[in-house]
């Protein structure tokens, strides 16, 4: 299963287009679990991809012709396609379906990939060609061409191309360390999350917890070959426990476990990693001439600088702070009504008594809505909404190999029946998957047509878009029933997915969600709040 999935995602654009055209007539994919050393598959391809990209860069640098937009900027944008595909698979699987070998590979390759990037971005001859085009063409080009030129030139500046030799060397050292430490940080969080279980054997300790969550905890215990019930730090288990469990001691225990991840005296402690990341980021920002890392990061955001961010936050405080204090006071009042005047509200109490107050004031319990949000029906509703709004259709494709048996693949078509994208949806938590929800691409869209020619689906390389969540799992007795919040999360990430699905650009580096990170939330907010 996963081996065939990886192989398919590593195809060249031409091979991929041929592959998906023939999928409908292919037999259904065998997506049962299989033994696969993904790291062993990917390692030689990534190393080879780095060598190939350097050869492509050398060709640009050694081009005897004067630098032009086509032979320098576009040529550079088209380098490293094989490397990009292989690293996309590696990093996406690190988040969605990781294992020890894959994490070891990522740790091994992080400094190598950082050095590879620096060897390109700090190449003086290459930057000279880029700057020559930028100086000559920046006020002449329009649209995507101008965006590609500006983004390329600024990318070199932000990667140290204008620094002194001494600062360039320090920049290399910093970025190598950052690549290792940021990766290690994420790996530690996942492992620490998976390490904790709250194992309950006395049913009295489940008081207050609705049957649906008890059943899920019982199935979790069975999967671990344990008696009783198991609650974890994954959201579908952790959040209901905090909201409903009457056992205050256990609420405190699981709350502290969740909020103290990677702070213990063990191999997963992130204190020094965080301190090092902060200091290294500050140093790299200052080397590049920025006041601090916030200003460096925000230069590529709509907000532009930290001053604008703080102004927005300070303006908002006047509108929400009094209301927030009032909400906390009301919850504390409710808690004292139940527990007595001497009761002191703690962080692990807030969700529990907040839910009690909501039930009293509004007769509202979020679990009351779950039967209306059965996952298969929600999928139909969300995809159907896209059909109604945008005219696109989704056809389930069981012939496409996926990386895990719960993943569902859809072919996406526009209103005229032209192929737009493949959408993968991966809904449920597992130990090999990080928490939260996100959208990503396994393959980016790009167009083979010449610039300024209208892009149509039949002359572009269509993307593979993935929506990954951690929704409540189904059990043998109960289908997957979502909360309203989970439905909103699905719509939010689906908005990001539509941004990728509708992509129609000439250059992959500008495709879909490759926009300012604050602007990228517009399609997701639109779908979430529609």
Model-found features: residue ranges?
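N-terminal helix-rich structural modules
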Residues: 2-209
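Short His/Asp/Glu-rich catalytic/ion-coordination signatures at enzyme active sites or charged loops
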Residues: 18-41, 89-109, 131-173, 232-272, ...
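Surface-exposed patches in mature extracellular/periplasmic domains of secreted proteins
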Residues: 60-64, 396-399, 524
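Active-site-proximal, well-structured secondary-structure segments within enzyme catalytic domains
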Residues: 144, 148-149, 177-180, 187, ...
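Inter-helical turn/loop segments and adjacent helix faces that build the functional surface
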Residues: 162-168, 392-398, 501-510
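Hydrophobic alpha-helix feature that most strongly marks membrane-spanning transmembrane helices
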Residues: 164, 259, 428, 472, ...
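Active-site recognition of the HExxH zinc-binding catalytic motif
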Residues: 282-285, 289, 386, 484-501, ...
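Post-HEXXH active-site segment of zinc metalloproteases
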Residues: 479-489, 500-526
